[in-house]
Amino acid sequence: MEQYVKYPPMTERQIELMQERLFRESGPFYHLCTKPLENEIIFQNDEERKVAINLMAITAKEFNIEILAFALMSNHFHFIVRGELIDGLSFFRRLKKRLSNYFSRQGRAGVLDMVDMDPDTPMIGSLTQLRNEIAYVIRNPYVARTDVNLFAWPWCSGYLYFNPLLSSLCSKSVNELSYKEKREISRATNPELDPSFRVRNGMITLESFVNYKLVEQLFPSAQKFLWWVLKNVEAQHEVASRRGEKPNLNDDELFLTAQQLARTTFGYESVKELPFQQRKELAVILKNKWGASNSQAARIAQLDQRTVDAMFPLTAKRK
């Protein structure tokens, strides 16, 4: 069975220097994303997501880019790409056109009219930032939906990395597909699929077009990769702030953040020791910096819900 990447015995410093060099030689890298639609859902079901994955794989092969990570959200897109920005933007324009044609045939014309990439997206400037951005993308579905298994959701690349069971998943080569199956995948009259593609359950496999092996080489270990995705809360805040967003943390993550704030900001050992006024100040920090909902702020800061709702009346009904 194929195993994920392993480095020969080295010190942590040697591994980091090697990965820094790989980052410099492999770039440039960009985090391409669209703003979430406020009043529209892009993907209403798994069939639409499957079509998007297939068209994404086909389109990526047509441009001089590689996808390192991605997440299809219900109302927006995230991609970490390797290549020039102009190629990444061209890739998304072509993908958007193809998806728009598909949605039009489904009676949903115009659903992507307001979906665009920022033409001034800055290049990812360091290895640390690249790791942060990859972790942010992979984590996105997990924090947005309670039913998502971070490492088993098929509409995000999260399950590819450091997965020794990946090579045991069954798939077919495109040469084994019928003409009808190829048309169904490509949504084209004259289907042409890259021979490197593998297909599983009517969908091009993510491992066929996502360069997950490069991502593995850019993280120190599987353990550190998991830490970056699940535990590096400060990095999540940094990426969200850079994008004009607020981090989306669950209760456990907010609780740990609040405990740290109790010690570093207020000089108490725990949240439960904070006086009432300091707990209100903590709620403000959790809301404004960490994106907590009113109910989360009340639970974590140990305040009455009515107190928090009075402090933040505009979001009082958003549980």
Q: Model-found features: residue ranges?
A:
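Short beta-strand->loop micro-motif that forms the acidic, two-metal-ion catalytic signature
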Residues: 76-83
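Short Pro-Cys-Gly-centered "Cys-loop" motif that presents a nucleophilic cysteine in a tight turn
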Residues: 1-69, 84-319
